[in-house]
UniProtKB/Swiss-Prot annotation:
The N-terminal domain interacts with the head of the 30S subunit; the C-terminal domain interacts with the body and contacts protein S4. The interaction surface between S4 and S5 is involved in control of translational fidelity. Keywords: Ribonucleoprotein, Ribosomal protein, RNA-binding, rRNA-binding. InterPro entries: Ribosomal_Su5_D2-typ_SF, Ribosomal_uS5, Ribosomal_uS5_bac-type, Ribosomal_uS5_C, Ribosomal_uS5_N, Ribosomal_uS5_N_CS, Ribsml_uS5_D2-typ_fold_subgr. It holds the Pfam family Ribosomal_S5. This is Small ribosomal subunit protein uS5. The gene is rpsE. Belongs to the universal ribosomal protein uS5 family. It comes from Xylella fastidiosa (strain Temecula1 / ATCC 700964). PROSITE patterns: RIBOSOMAL_S5 (PS00585), S5_DSRBD (PS50881).
Amino acid sequence: MAEERSQRSRDRSREEKIDDGMIEKLVAVNRVSKTVKGGRQFTFTALTIVGNGEGSVGFGYGKAREVPVAIQKSMEYARKRMSNVSLNNGTLWHPVKANHGAASVFMKPASEGTGVIAGGAMRAVLEAVGVKNVLAKAIGSRNPINLVRATLKGLEDMQSPTHIALKRGKNVRDFSHGS
């Protein structure tokens, strides 16, 4: 019974809640203390990812005196700051490198059936945006906030061959592999 309860609470911490078609993921909750004259003041921070599973994703960072309020604030903030990402049938268009601070990420498209091979904060972002097959590696700092920012930066900088061809005024066939 106790094992079942601990398993449920462990699953609930990273559970995706789907309402209005959005995937919500809790990446990290942190307790922060501030020392004042009367002792310590504790506050909580929450880092969350919100996505629609079809190329739209946002992240939020909320702070409050209680955990549920911090999570709610971060979810609202994430919904306000959504950005669109161009995907290629559930994977990336091309390999991507990005960094934020000391956190670097490398993401590579993968064939169908591979799944999301990524760790921690990167996995949450990739699943929320709707990537089904990808190989990803975090290099350097494993700070969740910087990893999320680096992953989003890499996804936002990725461009489809159609977009690149349009920008250069060329035909998409000019970019085919092997020529």
